[in-house]
């Protein structure tokens, strides 16, 4: 049965839409967009007071399957994604076995098709086993559906190995996503190196440990002509390096997370809250402000979550022994609405670019547009819905949110993936 969505405020900068129109969905496609639509026999849904936008895509998510299903699996991770308003996620390859060959890529895709609540786009490892010693089977992975290459979780430590990966892999036209961490310099760093790490007697994670590899990777991208994407950028100087690389004509993009925009090392002070232990670490107030400005001015290309679920008992360990990472799929949209859109610092149109259009562009995916003939991957949100993070639990298997207890304004209410509703009135279908 066709579905007519009426009275939503539709925002899609790619087709210059920003106003109240109706959207008719028939099967997996948008059949018609216009004012005062009438469709005989269609189910009618009134979306007054809500926004409808192209489906959001999170291009940095850890679904943990295969191998770490005790933390998260594809079913629970995509359920969390749908709850947060996402129609698609890019899955990182640090699984067990590592996604470094076509067989694992096929498993992720088939499992997502079987149990997923949104689309799953697998990324493939640059190197075998994420060890940085030998190139992975890039061609085989692309043939089976990999959309990008990354050793996320570690990063490629050897400059020569990264160059070889880029020189060879660029023929496939995929982006290389770089986790920038100089392991020798960072050592066993736990939180940002500075006053807070000194007060808490925790080993510091220097900003230079990230910035050195950002600079290196930009130079290697320039040398090879490969497409480079800097993951979870967290420092002001790192952002300047990306800005300079873009100005020099290097094919470089970058992403930022809500936790690096809206939390700082000061939130850790005297708390030892392991949910705030992330990689790269929460930085200074100045760094967070620079990242926010980069998101607004266009230097940052995409907002991602780096959704990293862990079991409660892992995060309950001593700070030095607890794993890095926090969950974010269910809070990302709401945080951006609360902190940037509802405060007037950023438009809904810019948010759509950061969370829907640019992620698809960087990953080489087909764009979704609110126009007739486009695939009906759509996100609907209520900008005035107020809720408290964690109050009603999580769809994710994990609970390690750094924003637990925070009251947010704005939340996804409905999600459509290929015309099929996966979130209805805030409930998973």
Where are these regions (language model features)?
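Divalent metal-coordination and catalytic microenvironments
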Residues: 8, 23, 28, 49, ...
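Active-site metal-binding motif and surrounding structural segment of the metallo-beta-lactamase
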Residues: 36-53
